[in-house]
Swiss-Prot record:
Its cofactor is K(+). Homotetramer. It comes from Korarchaeum cryptofilum (strain OPF8). It catalyses: IMP + NAD(+) + H2O = XMP + NADH + H(+). The gene is guaB. This is Inosine-5'-monophosphate dehydrogenase. The keyword Plastid does not apply.
């Protein structure tokens, strides 16, 4: 290696975005983006870490217009159940409807409602709808030995599969009902529309939804676990290969097999160089690249091994490869993004979306319980290469196959931050402000208009708050 061939692997604190002439107000900035066929209203994905993303985080992210990626440090059954929970959280037309027959007992109907947390059951004979029974019906049926046919509402109001949310709302209001069975022309039950789902759809107009109106969700997988990928396939919208170093022949070959055999869109990662991006996008039919190695706040890969690819450098390298080959592959910046300033720099360098771990850890929706220390509330946040995460064994191969006997992550505490909606709203507001300063109306313009400058250590110190003691530190 000759010293004159050294590359400058710059990171977020090495550069600054310069302000430009603008007519753009932050409130008018459009942050929509696409990852394959998945349209996002906000360009944010939650990281597949077991202290960041399970079903609660995924539901919240999708409702805000982002996307949650479920971690894989669990059994495949647990991961599937998380994905199912996201899909069930909202669905304009519920397809997998739980039903009863007229000859079932009221007690059986009551048990099903209690077990599944639902308030009504269509009544069918064969596949034909003959009635509907509600929680109110079973509540007032004092004799549990009565049959469903004795208390059900016969000939309920029904709609066809072409019904729209607006039409459903009007019908429910007119007839003062909360459930609308969806039937075919021959009267066979197709699905169910509930008032709750109509409400959620109207309350979250920018949510990330699939063709059936359900919330979208992704799941992390090992490229070597094709059985898990196949099991998850019916319940997720995208699979994300979850390895620290994707630019490995065994990993690439295993990922190609998943793409060929599973039939679900794939985001590949993590990568850190132009060459890795080039090989991934020319050899694999992927929709996105997860970019950055060793930059996460709880990742110690660079420290332990001396090998890393800082996220901003990696984004610039990967986006150059995507441009060269004119591929419709999204570049997703992953690691070291603590706030909207880092995200803005990533978009300027060519990112299409950002993946957040630390920025979302500690929120109410992040997995884990809160703890009180010194009068303040905290939550656990750990890297997937930390000893405690590796002890669960499901994600051990993220850092090699077979697993290396070294830890490449740490575990720590982060302050409890409350609802993730509030955290993301602030993040998005800061991001829009950055776009406004640059003069970019959208992500595409941010890539083309942003002027990036190197900044000295003194310059970085100057633009940070200085020469005063923050009030919160005095109160500490």
């Amino acid at each position: 290696m000759r010293i004159d061939r050294f590359e400058f692997a710059f990171t977020f604190n090495d550069v600054i975005l310069l302000p430009g002439k603008t007519e753009i107000e932050p409130s008018n900035v459009d942050l929509t983006t696409r990852i394959g066929n998945i349209a996002l209203s906000i360009p944010i994905l939650s990281s597949p870490m077991d202290t960041v993303t399970e079903e609660e985080m995924s539901i919240a992210m999708a409702r805000m217009g982002g996307l949650g990626i479920l971690h894989r440090n669990c059994s495949v059954e647990e991961q599937v159940n998380m994905a199912k929970a996201v899909k069930r959280a909202e669905s304009f037309i519920i397809r997998d409807v739980i039903t009863v027959s007229p000859e079932d007992s009221v007690e059986e109907a009551r048990r099903l409602m209690r077990e599944h947390g639902i308030s009504g059951l269509p009544v069918i004979v064969g596949r034909k709808l003959v009635g509907i029974v509600t929680r109110r019906d079973v509540y007032f049926a004092e004799n549990g030995s009565l049959l469903v046919k004795d208390i059900m509402t016969k000939d309920p109001i029904t709609v066809g599969p072409e019904i729209t949310p607006q039409e459903a709302r009007k019908i429910m209001a007119r007839y003062k009902i909360e459930k609308l069975p969806v039937v075919s022309e021959s009267g066979e039950l197709i699905g169910l529309v509930t008032a709750k789902d109509v409400f959620y759809r109207e309350s979250h107009p920018f949510a990330t939804r699939d063709e059936e109106g359900r919330l979208r969700v992704g799941a992390a997988i090992s490229p070597f676990d094709i059985d898990r990928a196949k099991t998850l396939a019916p319940y997720v919208d995208v699979l994300v290969t979850d390895v620290a170093h994707f630019h490995n022949e065994n990993v690439i070959s295993a990922t190609k097999r998943i793409i060929d055999e599973v039939g679900v869109p794939v985001i590949a990662g993590n990568i850190g160089t132009y060459e890795a991006a080039e090989e991934a996008i020319t050899r694999l039919d992927i929709i996105g690249l997860r970019v950055g190695i060793g930059s996460g706040s709880i990742c110690t890969t660079g420290e332990v091994t001396g090998v890393a690819a800082p996220t901003l450098y990696a984004v610039a390298s990967a986006s150059e490869a995507v441009r060269k080959y004119s591929k419709d592959v999204a570049v997703i910046a992953d690691g070291g993004i603590r706030g909207p300033g880092e995200a803005a720099k990533a978009f300027a360098m060519g990112a299409d979306a950002v993946m957040l771990g630390y920025a979302l850890a500690g929120t109410k929706e992040a997995p884990g319980s809160t703890m009180m220390i010194g009068g303040k509330m905290y939550k656990i946040y750990r890297g997937m290469g930390s000893p405690s995460a590796r002890s669960k064994r499901f994600a051990m191969d993220r850092y090699s196959k077979p697993s290396k006997d070294i830890a490449e992550g740490i575990e720590g505490l982060v302050p409890y931050r409350g609802d993730v909606t509030t955290v993301v709203d602030r993040f998005v507001a800061g991001l829009k402000a950055a776009f406004g300063y640059v003069g970019a109306a959208n992500i595409s313009e941010m890539k083309s208009k942003a002027r990036v400058a190197l900044i000295s250590h003194s310059g970085m110190s100057e633009i940070a708050p200085h020469d005063v003691k923050p009030l919160e530190k005095i109160s500490d």
